[in-house]
C-alpha cells in the first residue's frame, strides 16, 4: 500500500467570487518526484503556499505525513523555495545559511559546509550574494530549503535562471536526494520538457482545478507514438489485426479506440486489411505527443469553461 507524504481533499482557495483553487484532490506518494504542471495563473503557487502554511485555505483538508492536526509541526519537515526567496544580499552564501540555521534552531554547524558542497557553492568564498548570478542565487535558495534535511521538498520554478549545465546538475542533485535520502519532492515548472526528464508522477492544474494525476510510466505510454484506430467493430478489428495482420502489440482503451504500437509505417496496409474485410474505419492516424502537446490537448476542452 502506498504511503502518501501529502494529500489534499477538496482543497479550495477563494478570493471574493474568484476561486484560485477549486476542489483540488492531490496525492503525493513517498519517494516520488511530483511534477506540478500548469500555465501561469493556473494556481500552482497558490497551492504551494497553502501546503506550506503561507496562506489560509477557504475550504477542504490538507494532510501532511498522514496527519490533519498540528500541521505546524508537520511543516517543520518541509523545505521549500517559493518564487525567489529572500536572501541577504550583503552576506556570503555561507553567512546566509548560517543565519537560517540559527533561526531554525539547527544545532549541527557542519551542515553549512555539507550543504554548500551539495549545491555547488563551496567555492563561492567571500563573494556577496549581491554579486551572484541568478543561477547561483537559485542554488543558494535550494540550499536554504535543504537545511535540516527535510523529508519533503517543495520547489517552485527552481530552474529559472539556470544555464543548461546548471539544469542538468540540479536534475542529478534532486534524483540523488530521492535515492540517498528518500526525500519526496514537489516541483512546479513551466519548462515542461525538463519536468519530463525528472518527474516520476504528474498533476495537471488548469484554472485552479486539478484535471488529472498520472504516473510517468502511464504518461509515457499515452505519449508513445502509435496508430490510433477507431472502427465500428472492435472485436472483429482485433481478430483481423492478430490473425491476418500478425499485429499483437496493441491496446484497447475505454473510449473504444485501439492503439497500435507497431507497423507505424504501414497504416495503408492496416486500412486495406480492415476495409477489405468489411470493417468501417472511423479514424486511423499516427499519433504521439511530448509533454507540452499532451498538456495542450488535456486543457483544450477546458479553455472556454
Q: What kind of feature is each model-predicted range?
A:
Residues 103, 298-302:
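Phosphate/oxyanion-binding loops and surfaces in catalytic or ligand/nucleic-acid-binding neighborhoods
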Residues 53, 219-222, 250-252:
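Short, flexible turn/loop "capping" segments at secondary-structure junctions
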Residues 1-12, 301-305:
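ABC-family P-loop ATPase nucleotide-binding domain
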Residues 209-232:
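Conserved beta-strand-loop-alpha-helix hinge in the C-terminal portion
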